[in-house]
């Protein structure tokens, strides 16, 4: 029944594309692909215990837990996992993962609270033209951790860089089953010239787009440096992970679609679930984790 419904969704998307006078670009989920959930952010750390203590102390929606025999920090339905690094992880903004962060229902109060608790900030509280307030914390091992205005205090986003943000969004939709947050269908090619940097902070903000996996937004901005982005492996944020009911089936589907496989099927941690690693747009490493 599930496969029949997914096939019907693909057919409907194709019909919409044919009937629309403006021929908007519609990205259909690969046939047979189940809906994913966001699973975890995997960090490299010189001192995982200290890093876990930072996150659980700083964000009251988190707690220390055990996941498949691995020490982890849980934030609602997602996790932070840690690999003990023998050398300091890379922190240069030259990979696809820029930062990650939580929401704040009262930015001014939370910012003052964090300052009073001794949290250091890379970027102080700043207001965007939209009125949104944000700030970047100096996290453990050089990680950049954002808090920003939101209706929730949950872990809400991972911010990415891309050589072609709109193309990357299409990849996440087609191959992983991400949902576009765009307010209107896009027309034309996905490769679009970058705009000039804008304030605040002199950031290149266009073209940009957002897709959602489970409860987490992947916000995709243009890369801020010349030259292609490098692999996320070895950086402070080593990779992100999504979960599927059947990892073996998901991996085979992706392989047939031409997606690069970095790690074949293996056991996830010390549990019964399977896992694998693929490479997504801009050399981002993405782990696939089975749902037990």
Residue ranges of model-derived segments:
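N-terminal secretory signal peptides that target proteins for export/translocation
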Residues: 1-6
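Core segments of cupin and vicinal oxygen chelate
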Residues: 33, 39-85, 128-131, 136, ...
């Amino acid at each position: 029944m599930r496969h029949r419904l997914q096939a019907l969704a693909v057919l409907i998307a194709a019909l919409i594309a044919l009937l629309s006078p403006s021929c908007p670009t519609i990205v259909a989920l690969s046939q047979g692909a189940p809906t994913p959930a966001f699973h975890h952010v995997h960090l490299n750390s010189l001192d995982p215990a200290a890093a876990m203590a930072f996150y659980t102390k700083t964000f009251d929606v988190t707690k220390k837990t055990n996941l498949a025999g691995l020490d982890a920090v849980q934030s609602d339905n997602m996790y932070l996992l840690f690999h003990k690094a023998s050398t300091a992880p890379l922190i240069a903004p030259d990979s696809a993962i820029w930062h990650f962060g939580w929401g704040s229902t009262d930015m001014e109060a939370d910012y003052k609270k964090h300052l009073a608790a001794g949290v250091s900030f890379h970027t102080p509280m700043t207001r965007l033209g939209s009125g949104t307030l944000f700030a970047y914390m100096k996290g453990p091992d050089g990680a950049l951790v954002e808090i920003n205005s939101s209706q929730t205090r949950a872990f809400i986003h991972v911010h990415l860089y891309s050589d072609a943000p709109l193309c990357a969004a299409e990849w996440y939709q087609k191959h992983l089953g991400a949902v576009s947050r765009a307010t209107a269908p896009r027309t034309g090619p996905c490769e679009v010239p970058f705009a000039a940097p804008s304030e605040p902070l002199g950031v290149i903000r266009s073209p940009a787009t957002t897709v959602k996996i489970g409860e987490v937004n992947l916000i995709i901005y243009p890369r801020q440096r010349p030259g292609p982005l490098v692999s996320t492996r070895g950086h402070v944020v080593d990779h992100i992970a999504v979960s599927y009911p059947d990892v073996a089936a998901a991996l085979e589907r992706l392989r047939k679609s031409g997606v690069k496989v970095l790690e074949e099927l293996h056991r996830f941690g010390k549990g019964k679930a399977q896992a694998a690693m693929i490479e997504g747009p801009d050399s981002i490493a993405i782990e696939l984790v089975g749902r037990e």
